[in-house]
């Protein structure tokens, strides 16, 4: 099977949330079989920033669902959305 690179947007529940702590919690919650690549912060509006995460997963059935489910349960996370996917080379 090939690897798939996914760009995932994680929205914090508040503009006041400590994003460094949230990124540490997200990294700790990466499920088995998922390779964490990087985080970037993206300004949204009124001081709110999204965490853009890049991960690599197998192209098996379910794909990014384990990551989405695990990260949705992290305290301080409002939403988790896959922005883009593509094959890794």
Swiss-Prot record:
InterPro entries assigned: eEF-1beta-like_sf, EF1B_bsu/dsu_GNE, Transl_elong_EF1B/ribsomal_bS6, Transl_elong_EF1B_B_arc
CDD domains per the UniProt record, alphabetical: EF1B
Pfam families: EF1_GNE
Keywords: Elongation factor, Protein biosynthesis
SUPFAM superfamilies: eEF-1beta-like
GO molecular function annotation: translation elongation factor activity
HAMAP family with a match to the protein in the record: EF1_beta
Alphabetical list of PANTHER family matching this protein: ELONGATION FACTOR 1-BETA
Described purpose of this protein according to its UniProt entry: Promotes the exchange of GDP for GTP in EF-1-alpha/GDP, thus allowing the regeneration of EF-1-alpha/GTP that could then be used to form the ternary complex EF-1-alpha/GTP/AAtRNA.
Family: Belongs to the EF-1-beta/EF-1-delta family.
Protein name from the UniProt record: Elongation factor 1-beta
Annotated organism of origin: Methanocella arvoryzae (strain DSM 22066 / NBRC 105507 / MRE50)
């Amino acid at each position: 099977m090939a690897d798939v690179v996914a760009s995932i947007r994680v929205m914090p529940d508040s503009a006041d949330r400590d994003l460094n702590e949230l990124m540490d919690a997200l990294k700790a919650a990466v499920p088995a079989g998922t390779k964490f690549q990087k985080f970037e912060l993206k300004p949204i509006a009124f001081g709110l920033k999204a965490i853009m995460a890049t991960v690599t997963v197998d192209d098996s059935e379910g794909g990014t669902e384990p990551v989405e489910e695990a990260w949705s349960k992290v305290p301080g996370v409002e939403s988790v959305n896959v922005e883009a996917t593509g094959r890794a080379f």
